Amino acid sequence: MSRNIIRPAPGNKVLLVLDDATNHKLLGARERSGRTKTNEVLVRLRDHLNRFPDFYNLDAIKEGAEETDSIIKDL
């Protein structure tokens, strides 16, 4: 089975398994922000996707980085 086939996801939920270092950083960010761990992940993922909408296109990355006044204000 090829992993390069892109299929639509059946839903809008994601399960993440984090390594200890990443989890520790996320817990620290959660404490500093006062958000739940889930909301902290959501804010950070949205921000990343807005900053880097086309991760494999360097021109889009530069444009996205200029437009990042950002999602954190929206929440």
UniProtKB/Swiss-Prot annotation:
Chain segments annotated as coiled-coil in the UniProt record: none
Cross-referenced InterPro entries: TraY
Top-level division of the source organism's lineage: Bacteria
KW Plastid (keyword) present: no
Localization: Cytoplasm
GO MF annotation list: DNA binding
Keywords: Activator, Conjugation, Cytoplasm, DNA-binding, Plasmid, Transcription, Transcription regulation
Pfam families: TraY
A GO cellular component entry from the record: cytoplasm
Record note on quaternary structure: Part of the relaxosome, a complex composed of plasmid encoded TraI, TraM, TraY and host-encoded IHF bound to the F plasmid origin of transfer (oriT). Interacts with TraM, probably through its C-terminus.
Stated role: Conjugative DNA transfer (CDT) is the unidirectional transfer of ssDNA plasmid from a donor to a recipient cell. It is the central mechanism by which antibiotic resistance and virulence factors are propagated in bacterial populations. Part of the relaxosome, which facilitates a site- and strand-specific cut in the origin of transfer by TraI, at the nic site. Relaxosome formation requires binding of IHF and TraY to the oriT region, which then facilitates binding of TraI. Also positively regulates tra gene expression.
Family classification: Belongs to the TraY family.
Listed name of the protein: Relaxosome protein TraY
Organism of derivation: Escherichia coli
